[in-house]
Amino acid sequence: MPFLMIRNDITKVAADAIVNPANRNLLQGSGTSRAIYQAAGEQELTASCEAIGRCDWGRAVCTPAFGLPAKYIFHAVCPAWHGGGFGEAEQLASAYHSALKLAAKYHCESVAFPLLSSGNYGYPKEQAFRIAVDTITQYVMEHDLTVYLVLYDRDSLAVSRKLFASVEEYIDDHYVAQNDESYGFGRRRRELSERRRLLEEDAALPMLGAVPAPAAAPRTARSLESLMDNLGESFTTRLLRLIDERGLKDSTVYKQSNISRQHFSKIQCNRDYNPKKKTVLAFAVGLHLSEDETIDLLKSAGYAFSDGSKRDWIVRYCLEHKIYNINQVNTLLFEYDQEQLGA
C-alpha cells in the first residue's frame, strides 16, 4: 500500500522497479518496450535478456535497470488480445501478479507498471485497466508496497458513463456555479443582496431621540490557558476514536484509505500530528464517513471543504453517494487532473 495512478513517461518514473511489457522471447518490442530498452541501454538490456532466454505467458523475470532511474526491470510476458476467449484475462492478471511477487522477492518498496497489453497487444483498454486495478489492489491490501500505474491518457479509465455523467452534473451544479460567482457572473445578485443588507441595517438603527439601550457588560479577556483547555479533539485523537467506535482494525482502515503502514504509525504515535488535507479525506473515505462527519474530521486538522476546489466537490459527491472504494474515488480524481487521496 498505497496504489496511485500517474500520467508520465514510465522511463522517467523514480521507482525501485519498472515493469516492461515483454514477449515470450524477451526481445525488444515496440512502443513502451522500445522506450524502456532505449532508456536503459539497448546493448546491455538485450544481452541480459538473452542470457535468460524465454519466459512463459503470465510470468515475469528480472534484469538490472541499467540507465533507468530504478534498480530493476521486471519483464512481464503479456497476452495479446484474441477476442477474450483464450484465457487472456487470466494471463494478464498473472503477469501483474508475477511482477508484484518479484517486487517482494527483491525487497522493493515501489514498482511502476504501464497498462500491460493495452498497446500493440490490442487488449481493450477499459478491460485492461480493470484487471490492472483489481490485481494490484488485491495485492497491496496484503503487502507494504507502493504501486504506480503509469497512464498516457484517459482513454483507459474504466469509469462508467453513467457515473461520469452524474459527477459532471454535480460539478456543474456546485464547483462551476461557485466559480462563475467568483469571476463576476453573479455580481448583480451580490449587489442586490448587499443593498438589502444595508436597508435592513438602516431599519434596525434607533430613531433619533430614542432612549438608548443599556450598555452591554464588558467582556473579560480569556486567558490563553483557558482557551487551550477548550480545544477540541486533535486529528489523531478523533481518527483513533472513529476507528474504535466502528470496531475496525487499524490495518483495515489504513489500507482502505490508501495509506501506508509507516504513515499510519507516524499519525498514531503523535497526538499533535498535522496531516495533509488529502490524508484526512482519504481516511474519510476509508472510514465510510458521512459528509458531516468528514467536515468534523477536517476541522480537527484545521481544514474545511473549499467551494473553489474541484477535488473537494468530487470527494463530497463520493461521500454523498456512498462511493467508498478509494481506487474508484482516485480514478475520478485522476480523470479530472486532481490530486489523488492517500500516500
Give, region by region, the residue ranges found by the protein language model.
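A short, Lys/Arg-rich alpha-helix, primarily the initiator
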Residues: 211-250, 327-343
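Divalent-metal-activated hydrolytic enzyme cores
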Residues: 123-221, 341
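Recognition helix of helix-turn-helix/homeodomain-like DNA-binding domains
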Residues: 258-275, 299-302
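Glycine-/small-residue-enriched capping loops at alpha/beta junctions
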Residues: 1-103
